[in-house]
Curated annotation (Swiss-Prot):
UniProt feature coiled coil, ranges: none
Residues with a covalently attached lipid (N-palmitoyl cysteine): C22
Protein's name according to its UniProt entry: Outer membrane protein assembly factor BamE
Source superkingdom: Bacteria
Subunit text: Part of the Bam complex.
Annotated region described as Disordered, given as residue ranges: 117-147, 156-175
GO terms under biological process: Gram-negative-bacterium-type cell outer membrane assembly; protein insertion into membrane
UniProt source species: Pseudomonas fluorescens
Length: 175
């Protein structure tokens, strides 16, 4: 009886020690995204002099509009991958008294799209095409007079160029 009790206690103690050495499997954590997703393509579309409506159309509603600085909109985006470190991006858009875009600042690189930033400009893959002889340009043969090709060429030569109209600026005054 005494030996059985001692044996049972020792097996329990050894079992608990073995379990203490094992780690518990991690719990799955989802990615947490918050705020406005602002892509580099959106930033590239912004131009000085744009109205608030045009900026809102491109960027969406601002996450923060400062009550003390009504001419400033802040776009925040944060991503925390499950179990990873939180990453945050910020873009501030500033307007003048005429509600026109004056400047922007924040976490972006002009001219580099998000895809290029993630993938890199050079993927490291080199592809060489087989060498081919350069084609010699064919000499242009004039169309036969009265043929369909001659008629089309005459129509193209007689086309009048028309200047492209510039759009009127949007009226931003209250009605």
């Amino acid at each position: 009886m005494q030996n059985t009790k001692l044996l049972l206690t020792s097996f329990t103690f050894v079992g608990l020690l073995a379990l203490a050495g094992c780690s518990f499997p991690g719990v799955y954590k989802i990615d947490i995204q918050q705020g406005n997703v602002v892509t580099q393509d959106m930033i590239d579309q912004l131009r000085p002099g744009m109205t608030r409506r045009q900026v809102r159309f491109i960027m969406g509603n601002a996450l923060l509009t400062d009550t003390f600085h009504a001419d400033r909109w802040d776009y925040l985006y944060s991503l925390q991958p499950g179990g990873g470190e939180r990453q945050q991006e910020r873009v501030s858009v500033i307007f003048n008294g005429n509600d026109q875009l004056v400047s922007l600042s924040g976490d972006f690189m002009p001219g580099v799209s998000r895809d290029e930033a993630l993938l890199g400009k050079d993927s490291g893959t080199n592809v060489t095409a087989p060498a081919q002889e350069a084609e010699k340009p064919k000499s242009e043969v004039p169309a036969k007079p009265g043929s369909l090709l001659d008629t089309i060429q005459k129509d193209i030569d007689n086309v009048e160029t028309v200047p492209v109209p510039t759009p009127e600026p949007l009226d931003t005054s209250p009605q």
